[in-house]
């Protein structure tokens, strides 16, 4: 399946809104989320999400242990907060500049434009949603 139909399917399944989760992520969405996570998040957060990626040592601040994100928030992954951190576009400009984590919303938008996609914002939301769904699978009890 090409990336465009997949992004449309994922975005439609999520209702195109932040914080709206599907009852269960699709296998396809989890695969996309895993691919995105391993390519974009694992260099700092590590393949298992413990904050021990190969680039972690070169950062001023150690990356968060993503496996305990839900535990640190009362046992439930704070989806709106996680979405905002991953997307990053709604954060104050100074906050964006001070953080080591890329603003993935901008990065995905740039990627969509480079691919000459017509569905730029649905593509961005679908990618972030997929990463968020995969992040749920990394949580420890």
Predicted features and spans:
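N-terminal secretory signal peptides that target proteins for export/translocation
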Residues: 1-4
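Bacterial N-terminal signal peptides
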Residues: 8-17
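Electrostatic cytochrome c docking/interface patches
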Residues: 19-36, 74-75
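Stable alpha-helical elements in mature extracytoplasmic
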Residues: 29, 37, 78-81, 124-127, ...
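Sec-exported extracytoplasmic/periplasmic mature domains
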Residues: 38, 42, 87-91, 136-140
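Short, non-ligating residues that shape and space the ligands of small metal-coordination modules
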Residues: 50-51
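Extracytoplasmic electron-transfer domains, predominantly the class I c-type cytochrome c fold
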Residues: 58-120, 131-135
């Amino acid at each position: 399946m090409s990336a465009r139909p997949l992004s449309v399917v994922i975005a439609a399944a999520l209702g195109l809104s932040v914080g709206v989760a599907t009852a269960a992520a699709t296998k396809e969405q989890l695969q996309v989320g895993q691919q995105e996570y391993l390519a974009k998040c694992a260099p700092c957060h590590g393949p298992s999400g413990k904050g021990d990626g190969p680039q972690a040592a070169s950062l001023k601040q150690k990356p968060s242990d993503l496996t305990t994100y839900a535990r640190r928030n009362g046992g439930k992954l704070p989806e709106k907060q996680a979405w905002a951190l991953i997307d990053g576009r709604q954060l104050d400009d100074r906050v964006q500049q001070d953080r080591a984590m890329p603003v993935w919303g901008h990065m995905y938008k740039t990627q969509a434009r480079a691919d000459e996609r017509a569905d730029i914002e649905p593509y961005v939301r679908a990618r972030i949603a997929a990463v968020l769904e995969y992040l749920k699978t990394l949580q420890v009890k």
